[in-house]
A protein has these predicted regions:
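An acidic, low-aromatic, low-complexity terminal/linker signal
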Residues: 1-144
Length: 144
Protein backbone atom coordinates (compact mmCIF):
# COMPACT_ATOMS: atom_id res chain seq x y z
CA UNK A 1 0.00 0.00 0.00
CA UNK A 2 1.34 3.43 -0.95
CA UNK A 3 0.59 6.30 1.41
CA UNK A 4 1.81 9.89 1.48
CA UNK A 5 3.18 10.96 4.85
CA UNK A 6 4.10 14.35 6.26
CA UNK A 7 7.30 14.17 8.31
CA UNK A 8 7.43 16.60 11.25
CA UNK A 9 9.28 17.04 14.54
CA UNK A 10 7.38 17.01 17.82
CA UNK A 11 9.15 17.05 21.21
CA UNK A 12 12.47 16.44 19.48
CA UNK A 13 11.27 13.33 17.64
CA UNK A 14 10.76 12.87 13.90
CA UNK A 15 7.28 11.44 13.35
CA UNK A 16 4.93 10.83 10.43
CA UNK A 17 1.32 11.92 9.93
CA UNK A 18 -0.84 10.68 7.04
CA UNK A 19 -1.32 13.51 4.56
CA UNK A 20 -4.95 12.43 4.21
CA UNK A 21 -5.43 13.90 7.71
CA UNK A 22 -3.65 17.19 6.88
CA UNK A 23 -5.49 20.14 5.35
CA UNK A 24 -2.50 22.50 5.21
CA UNK A 25 0.76 23.57 6.84
CA UNK A 26 0.88 27.15 8.13
CA UNK A 27 2.85 29.60 10.23
CA UNK A 28 0.75 30.89 13.10
CA UNK A 29 1.40 34.47 14.16
CA UNK A 30 -1.29 35.57 16.57
CA UNK A 31 -2.42 33.35 19.41
CA UNK A 32 -5.25 34.29 21.77
CA UNK A 33 -5.32 32.36 25.07
CA UNK A 34 -8.56 30.63 26.08
CA UNK A 35 -9.36 30.95 29.80
CA UNK A 36 -9.99 27.63 31.56
CA UNK A 37 -9.16 25.57 28.46
CA UNK A 38 -7.36 22.26 28.80
CA UNK A 39 -3.59 22.66 29.26
CA UNK A 40 -2.84 21.31 25.77
CA UNK A 41 -5.03 23.99 24.12
CA UNK A 42 -2.54 26.78 23.38
CA UNK A 43 -5.26 29.19 22.27
CA UNK A 44 -7.12 30.38 19.19
CA UNK A 45 -5.77 31.75 15.93
CA UNK A 46 -7.35 33.07 12.73
CA UNK A 47 -6.58 31.64 9.31
CA UNK A 48 -8.39 32.79 6.17
CA UNK A 49 -11.50 33.92 8.09
CA UNK A 50 -11.61 30.70 10.13
CA UNK A 51 -10.92 30.35 13.82
CA UNK A 52 -8.51 27.52 14.61
CA UNK A 53 -8.23 25.82 17.97
CA UNK A 54 -4.46 25.62 18.45
CA UNK A 55 -3.11 22.48 20.11
CA UNK A 56 0.32 22.39 21.77
CA UNK A 57 1.45 18.96 20.54
CA UNK A 58 4.09 18.61 23.26
CA UNK A 59 1.52 19.32 26.00
CA UNK A 60 -0.98 16.99 24.28
CA UNK A 61 1.58 14.20 24.73
CA UNK A 62 1.90 15.04 28.43
CA UNK A 63 5.54 16.14 27.95
CA UNK A 64 5.44 19.72 29.24
CA UNK A 65 4.80 22.51 26.74
CA UNK A 66 6.33 23.93 23.58
CA UNK A 67 8.79 26.78 23.84
CA UNK A 68 7.00 30.08 23.14
CA UNK A 69 7.84 31.66 19.77
CA UNK A 70 6.51 34.64 17.83
CA UNK A 71 5.80 32.43 14.81
CA UNK A 72 4.98 28.74 15.06
CA UNK A 73 4.68 26.08 12.40
CA UNK A 74 1.46 24.14 12.57
CA UNK A 75 -0.44 21.44 10.75
CA UNK A 76 -4.10 22.23 10.11
CA UNK A 77 -6.53 19.33 10.41
CA UNK A 78 -10.31 19.26 10.31
CA UNK A 79 -12.19 16.96 12.66
CA UNK A 80 -15.95 16.76 12.36
CA UNK A 81 -16.08 20.24 10.83
CA UNK A 82 -13.86 21.84 13.50
CA UNK A 83 -10.46 23.17 12.34
CA UNK A 84 -7.44 22.57 14.58
CA UNK A 85 -3.81 23.65 14.27
CA UNK A 86 -1.24 21.26 15.74
CA UNK A 87 1.94 23.10 16.74
CA UNK A 88 5.07 21.25 15.59
CA UNK A 89 8.76 22.09 15.99
CA UNK A 90 9.51 21.64 12.29
CA UNK A 91 7.92 20.45 9.07
CA UNK A 92 10.39 18.37 7.11
CA UNK A 93 8.92 16.84 3.97
CA UNK A 94 6.16 14.85 2.31
CA UNK A 95 7.29 11.33 1.45
CA UNK A 96 5.78 8.29 -0.16
CA UNK A 97 5.66 5.19 2.02
CA UNK A 98 5.15 1.93 0.17
CA UNK A 99 5.44 -0.47 3.09
CA UNK A 100 2.72 -1.47 5.48
CA UNK A 101 2.31 0.11 8.89
CA UNK A 102 4.07 -2.14 11.39
CA UNK A 103 3.17 -2.55 15.06
CA UNK A 104 5.25 -0.67 17.63
CA UNK A 105 7.66 -3.18 19.15
CA UNK A 106 9.25 -1.00 21.80
CA UNK A 107 8.12 0.65 25.01
CA UNK A 108 6.77 4.17 24.56
CA UNK A 109 5.94 6.94 26.99
CA UNK A 110 2.18 6.93 27.71
CA UNK A 111 1.54 10.02 25.57
CA UNK A 112 3.31 8.58 22.53
CA UNK A 113 1.63 5.22 23.07
CA UNK A 114 -1.80 6.88 23.04
CA UNK A 115 -1.23 8.59 19.67
CA UNK A 116 0.78 5.84 17.93
CA UNK A 117 -0.81 4.09 14.95
CA UNK A 118 2.36 2.07 14.34
CA UNK A 119 5.75 2.55 12.74
CA UNK A 120 6.66 3.12 9.10
CA UNK A 121 9.98 2.91 7.29
CA UNK A 122 11.04 6.15 5.63
CA UNK A 123 14.44 6.35 3.91
CA UNK A 124 15.78 3.53 6.07
CA UNK A 125 14.54 5.05 9.35
CA UNK A 126 11.62 3.78 11.40
CA UNK A 127 9.26 6.63 12.28
CA UNK A 128 6.26 6.61 14.57
CA UNK A 129 3.04 7.14 12.61
CA UNK A 130 0.78 9.25 14.80
CA UNK A 131 -2.98 9.76 14.88
CA UNK A 132 -3.86 13.47 14.69
CA UNK A 133 -7.29 12.83 16.25
CA UNK A 134 -5.70 11.21 19.32
CA UNK A 135 -3.20 14.06 19.62
CA UNK A 136 -6.01 16.63 19.65
CA UNK A 137 -7.81 14.71 22.40
CA UNK A 138 -4.87 15.46 24.72
CA UNK A 139 -3.55 13.71 27.80
CA UNK A 140 -6.97 13.52 29.48
CA UNK A 141 -7.90 10.89 26.88
CA UNK A 142 -5.41 8.53 28.57
CA UNK A 143 -7.44 8.60 31.78
CA UNK A 144 -10.75 7.89 30.05
Amino acid sequence: MTELLLIVSIAGARVAIATADVESVVELEGLTPVPRAAAHVAGLSALRSRVLTVIDSVAALGLGSSAPKAQREAIVVDIDGHPYALIVEAVEDVVECEGAVQPVRTALDPGWKRVARGVVEVDGDLLLLIDAHALIAGPAAMAA
